[in-house]
């Protein structure tokens, strides 16, 4: 049936990659079964599955046995099987150092070198090259490669060249010994030209020593006049550039060579020269550029005859501008020449790629000049030219679907100038919004880019709006009066463009094909919500989002609601969550959305003093709303809703999605609201619970002056303990969030500081000598966290309203408690911006441990003889996953902490006394560094006494900055120490004989 349906049928299990069904040994047995098959296709199919097996189970024992097995089949199999073994070695490069018997592996496959089949020998040479990283100094292999270079078979020689390139990159001795051999082959008349072109790139790896690199450079320079053909010149220049960029010593000389070849009339040679310039302009080698080289390079711009060469030339200037040292030199000495050069490229109406690249060069120069003090006047003319041409380039590239990359370049560098000059940013926002809001049709990709650019501009101005007085870009007037008031916040120019953005959003939603522009709808919605962060949304904005409910799918609606929660617009979020929760089919999703809806409703009560149901029916009433809910009632209702959200979230969690961070965060938030409720209770109780008559004598006896104010003093101190408990809980949640994004970690830092600050304010009231105030370590690098931090700054300013009293004459009055209530009002009326990690996991890092010895069953302990040491071996695998191109943080090392605690002491006789000073708890720590995502460690646990011990292994992750994260797994087992019969106590002597009677033996 298989040949009729076209379905491939395998005789061994194909579902071995399912981790829940098989372990590594079972998978290896399945693959071994395929290798032993008589059909070559099944054998090859089994071989190609090994790289995935190594990724899933990167244990040295498994990898070693697998490669030994593959070596046997490499020797006995066909060339097709050898080819797939070669592919396995190439794809499993990260796991080659886990081959324990690498000598046996090489010895086994090296037998093929004596074969009469040149293809088999070629496959062997390529396999040896693939594993060269773990056998760099194998002299036998070096000799085999040298002999293979003299072969008369082209396939074998090409394989030997490949192996030479691999070994030259790993072995210094091989590179030195092969230098003369390769030189002779290149100059030999018997070696064909294509083979010589393959030999030249081998020389680029010979940079292990300065003498070798110098020798190879001279060899290449000697080859240039001997082989003036285009292909040879291109290959030699590329090789010389690679050598110079790695040694850095030869960069000035290589620049002179490249400048000479810029005058070559052959276009491919000039393009290679420009690419070499671009390589040498990188971060590693740009500091080695001499000053005359930059001037000589700019003078040779006229030699670039076509658009591709001009684009490459501008790319070199862009890289030079990114380095502060060379950028300053360009502005001081070559500003006029650069400006003339870039204007010439921008004026080309038929090549927008080159024009936008020239605009990028000018933008980098402007941004650098504006940020550097005293250099602003140098870039005024450049900024004028940027203002003159930016709008034209934006309009020309936005309407062409083939210019998406060019449009991205214009928008990116426009945002870069905005971060250095707010005035330019205001005009740039007007340009982009006017272009987006006109009636012209844009390709969907270009429209999305402009929406993303507006979001980036809005983020920058929101950061400026809520910037601290000590933050960057905030000019402090020395002549201003010193007052307690905060400086007025800066205005976000995006607010003035909000009607135009809303009009564009409504236009897209009303279109019949709005499903094709969902991404633009999401970005524009995010832009509106970010612009109005901290504000009460106008009715037109709410009506626009209500219109989305009937036009968009559930996933897009959820993303909009998620953005609303992240920017503190909880009414819109609750409205969308409630609607979507009634549509979804999955129970887990339903309860998750219900929990989010309850969270948003709780925050609505805290922020606005009105229930969500009332706001839904009377969002913009024509008459004054009913009296707001009192503060105590608000906190009580919000706490109840958070408890309901906790129950809903537990119902929505599953073993695959445990929602650990979400549950912990909701617990802390509910705990914090209950603490605020306690503070309001203390304020209300002060009126009805006056100090007792004996309060003065109690204060004198306890030597605590503030005890004379009675009940309120103890309640405030109890409140301080509750706030410090919240602070510690936030700190623990921070330490356990290794995979969280930067916004979430900043949010947790600010939340922790808010608890510490509020506790310090109350301490300054209820203690005679309060401790030092907490230090604010972050001001927020994102709009939502900086807005949160700005509320903490308002709390610090509010603290100044406390009466200034000496330590020995402090009082606790209504004025003090009114300040506490005002602090709570600031906390509750500041919209909560839920952290991103609450909704999205952009990075996942898991550690899977294997601990030995293991008990026979989960209920049985591990038996150990008394007086011996227990050897505990730990092996683990790191599994990474990231949706971003760059990880937020990586695992540098893993700390293993082993704790042994006596839980059941051994039985003792009535006359035996316990040992004095005996420690029943042992803690051992070890830091291991993962090798290719595999870690191993061992402990020698001393156990001297009998009984039962609880052995617990905890894992902590240490990132590249040395920060320890409590995010690893935890495993435990029970160890039973067996009593040694030979060491049991002898029976007590008989007391039947009379005292003093001599015993006879």
Curated annotation (Swiss-Prot):
Question: Keywords on this record?
Answer: Cytoplasm, Nucleus
On the tree of life, the source organism's domain of life is Eukaryota
Give the location in the cell: Nucleus; Cytoplasm
Query: For bias kind Polar residues, which ranges apply?
Result: 989-1001
Q: Where is this region: Disordered?
A: 980-1001
A Pfam family found in this protein is INTS7_C
| Main location per the UniProt record | nucleus
The record's Gene Ontology cellular component field reads: cytoplasm; INTAC complex; integrator complex; nucleus
GO annotation (BP), single: RNA polymerase II transcription initiation surveillance
What is this protein's function per UniProt? Component of the integrator complex, a multiprotein complex that terminates RNA polymerase II (Pol II) transcription in the promoter-proximal region of genes. The integrator complex provides a quality checkpoint during transcription elongation by driving premature transcription termination of transcripts that are unfavorably configured for transcriptional elongation: the complex terminates transcription by (1) catalyzing dephosphorylation of the C-terminal domain (CTD) of Pol II subunit Polr2A/Rbp1 and Spt5, and (2) degrading the exiting nascent RNA transcript via endonuclease activity.
Q: Provide the assembly information.
A: Belongs to the multiprotein complex Integrator, at least composed of IntS1, IntS2, IntS3, IntS4, omd/IntS5, IntS6, defl/IntS7, IntS8, IntS9, IntS10, IntS11, IntS12, asun/IntS13, IntS14 and IntS15. The core complex associates with protein phosphatase 2A subunits mts/PP2A and Pp2A-29B, to form the Integrator-PP2A (INTAC) complex.
Please report which protein family the annotation says this sequence is part of.
Belongs to the Integrator subunit 7 family.
Miscellaneous? The name 'deflated' originates from the 'deflated balloon' appearance of mutant abdomens.
Q: What is this protein called?
A: Integrator complex subunit 7
- Please state the gene responsible for encoding this protein: defl
